């Protein structure tokens, strides 16, 4: 019942904004889809997904599937929380943000890779955490495959593979299972890199990681402190750090030193030079780098959404009263303008049709109903408190979703720049971690019961009703024909965490 209004909101978004919303990156994904090539700027797994759906010639099919993925994420969060012992109301509460956040609904409506990425990551997490006794070999392999596919969508799958691998080692999962996850994860990644090598002459996922890291350090890089070699001096700037623009300006705008490089900066040679320069800046100014990352990450926890990185980008995260124009610029003029292949994908007009009154409803809803960043931060703190209580088990099962949530926010700030759309996929993991950390049977759950003055009670053992009839029937069920008291005859039932602590083989 809780999900029904969330479904209706997504139906309203489809009817009000027919049949998609646009972000600048959307058109590069479509360019790569129509011409079926791997983008040197970013991983093109989402373009491959769009290519699979292209025979429908419909953006409605794309966005409806993404709305369904968003709903599926909520279902998985609820199901996993309940399966690991959370009360129904608490599991429901964990799923509410992804169901009802207005910005989440708008993100699902964008032709962007974030929702498929979120779906794959939540599915992998659910698979790994589902069995209290630990994941099987097949489960680890499938989770690894999902992470590999996620890395082909956005270059965050491999860092998160490290998170999964460390978690499984902490939970004493066998090395064979950890190896299976890693090897299977690398299969789609290596295949993608091989095709990229054929197209661009570089065994990599893109020719942009160095460029983006360069943009990160250019907010503070001081060349006199860095011992810059001659071939990298052209990457320096004389503008004082206090007067420099935001990080992304050093990628996309003409004043950027990278703009001097011909051919374009998204090629193997300039990307490598930019990466060398960035690493040099981090090594020479580690505290400045840490401050830049911390300042950007802190934006995720503000109560209000301030306009960032600029008004044009901020507006693309809103349901607007009018259809936004398709940009006239293009990152590869030889292939044609963005409007041409946005139209080619559906063989029709690619402009969003804004239809009242449906558009009015979801537009007003988005402005007022969303999870403030401060609340997201508090949820993270709740999860962290549960991890601290479970310090003897290094955080327990909640460690995995909590670490994923934090990584999804910190990694973009550390490698490029903060963006609001990177926060939304982090929220379900934070909610899941907080609920799992304080579920009955965990250290957090036992702490809550002690705080309330109640003894520990496993969630799978029913509470005594206190009535004579109930007590009698309960006693007869437990004693059976043998007459053995229930305390002696009932097997010890512990939580998944307790069972694992007693197991001789945690694999």
Describe each model-derived feature in a short phrase.
Residues 24, 62-71, 96-128, 137-138, ...:
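Multi-pass, polyprenyl lipid-linked donor-dependent membrane glycosyltransferases
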Residues 77-100, 115-119, 132, 137-140, ...:
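Transmembrane-helix signature of polytopic, membrane-embedded enzymes
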């Amino acid at each position: 019942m809780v999900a029904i209004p969330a479904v209706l909101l997504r139906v309203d978004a489809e009817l009000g904004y027919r049949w998609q919303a646009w972000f600048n990156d959307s058109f590069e994904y479509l360019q790569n889809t129509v011409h079926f090539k791997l983008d040197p700027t970013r991983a093109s797994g989402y373009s491959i997904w769009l290519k699979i759906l292209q025979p429908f010639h419909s953006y409605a099919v794309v966005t409806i599937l993404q709305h369904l993925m968003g709903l599926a994420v909520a279902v998985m969060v609820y199901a996993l929380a309940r399966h690991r012992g959370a009360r129904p109301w608490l599991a429901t509460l964990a799923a509410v943000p992804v169901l009802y956040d207005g910005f989440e609904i708008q993100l699902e409506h964008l032709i962007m890779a974030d929702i498929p990425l979120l779906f794959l990551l939540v599915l992998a997490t659910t698979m790994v955490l589902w069995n209290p006794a630990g994941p099987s070999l097949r489960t680890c392999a499938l989770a690894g495959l999902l992470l590999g596919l996620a890395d082909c969508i956005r270059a965050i799958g491999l860092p998160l593979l490290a998170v999964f691998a460390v978690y499984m080692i902490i939970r004493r999962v066998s090395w064979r299972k950890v190896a299976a996850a890693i090897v299977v994860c690398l299969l789609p990644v290596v295949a993608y890199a091989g095709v990229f090598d054929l197209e661009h002459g570089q065994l990599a996922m893109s020719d942009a990681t160095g460029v983006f890291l360069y943009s990160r350090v250019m907010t503070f890089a001081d060349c006199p402190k860095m011992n810059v070699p001659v071939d990298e001096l052209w990457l320096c700037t004389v503008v004082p750090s206090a007067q420099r623009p935001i990080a992304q300006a050093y990628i996309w705008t003409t004043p950027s030193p990278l703009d001097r490089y011909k051919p374009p900066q998204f090629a193997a040679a300039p990307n490598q030079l930019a990466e060398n320069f960035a690493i040099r800046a981090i090594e020479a100014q580690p505290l400045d780098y840490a401050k830049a990352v911390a300042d950007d990450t802190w934006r995720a926890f503000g109560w209000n959404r301030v306009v960032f990185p600029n008004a044009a980008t901020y507006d693309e995260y809103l349901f607007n009263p009018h259809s936004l124009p398709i940009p006239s610029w293009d990152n590869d003029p030889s292939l044609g303008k963005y409007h041409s292949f946005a139209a080619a994908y559906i063989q029709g007009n690619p402009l969003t049709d804004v239809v009242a009154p449906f558009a009015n409803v979801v537009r007003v809803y988005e402005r007022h109903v969303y999870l403030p960043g401060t609340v997201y931060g508090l949820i993270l703190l709740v999860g962290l408190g549960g991890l601290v209580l479970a310090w003897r088990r290094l955080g327990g099962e909640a460690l995995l979703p909590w670490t994923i949530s934090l990584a999804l926010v910190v990694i973009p700030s550390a490698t490029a720049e903060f963006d609001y759309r990177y926060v939304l996929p982090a929220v379900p993991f934070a909610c899941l971690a907080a609920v799992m950390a304080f579920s009955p049977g965990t250290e957090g759950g036992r702490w809550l019961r002690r705080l309330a003055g109640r003894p520990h009670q496993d969630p799978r053992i029913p509470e005594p009703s206190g009535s004579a009839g109930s007590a009698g029937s309960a006693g007869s069920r437990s004693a059976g024909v043998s007459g053995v008291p229930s305390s002696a005859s009932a097997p010890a039932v512990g939580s998944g965490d307790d069972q694992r602590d007693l197991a001789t083989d945690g694999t």
